[in-house]
Swiss-Prot record:
The keyword Cytoplasm does not apply. GO terms for molecular function: serine-type endopeptidase activity. It comes from the Bacteria. One of its GO terms (biological process) is proteolysis. Belongs to the peptidase S1B family. It comes from Staphylococcus aureus (strain NCTC 8325 / PS 47). It holds the Pfam family Trypsin. Gene3D superfamilies: Trypsin-like serine proteases (2.40.10.10). Residues 1-36 form the signal peptide. Induction: Positively regulated by agr (accessory gene regulator). The gene is splC. InterPro entries: Peptidase_S1_PA (IPR009003), Peptidase_S1_PA_chymotrypsin (IPR043504), Peptidase_S1B (IPR008256), Peptidase_S1B_tx (IPR008353), Trypsin_dom (IPR001254), V8_his_AS (IPR028301). Keywords: Hydrolase, Protease, Secreted, Serine protease, Signal. This is Serine protease SplC.
Amino acid sequence: MNKNIVIKSMAALAILTSVTGINAAVVEETQQIANAEKNVTQVKDTNIFPYNGVVSFKDATGFVIGKNTIITNKHVSKDYKVGDRITAHPNGDKGNGGIYKIKSISDYPGDEDISVMNIEEQAVERGPKGFNFNENVQAFNFAKDAKVDDKIKVIGYPLPAQNSFKQFESTGTIKRIKDNILNFDAYIEPGNSGSPVLNSNNEVIGVVYGGIGKIGSEYNGAVYFTPQIKDFIQKHIEQ
């Protein structure tokens, strides 16, 4: 049977059961089928690498690149200022908690949508007393390079409020690289801004800045980490 017909039939059944209350499990199964069609899976344990390197903001994503240092987008960091408290920690079914205070925000001087945040090492709210950021996350390493058709994964927090701030992983391939821009076909949604684009070795290639939320789209975009961008980031990693 055609897979699209199955998905449409399941979706129709899900609508019916949501009204009648017959079987809520059908709704969950339908969502799982839809996610499988997009090559998207929910991360169950965010305490293991590479998932413990991807942190949740209130409506976006970031990832750890060094001691007390997080990469995200300018359009994410513009909503914050030094001294603000953020839920910069991996989240999910086994999230480790902790709220941290921002020490500095450094935007990339070019047009590229990259921002580096440095945070206080000790949690100021939630989590055990004296909760240490670096003991509960793992920083990513830079990939040496990347090329078209390389397999990639994107990890982040799509539709965070709707998905209860759970972490998801999507997979795909690189479709093109031009200057500082990388296009890929892994499925992304609002909330994936600031997600890392990783190669098969879980090394970071770039940071997601936008997409059109369409299966198979080749126009989802990330800032590609060129030597110049890597150098900027490296200079802002806390020593």
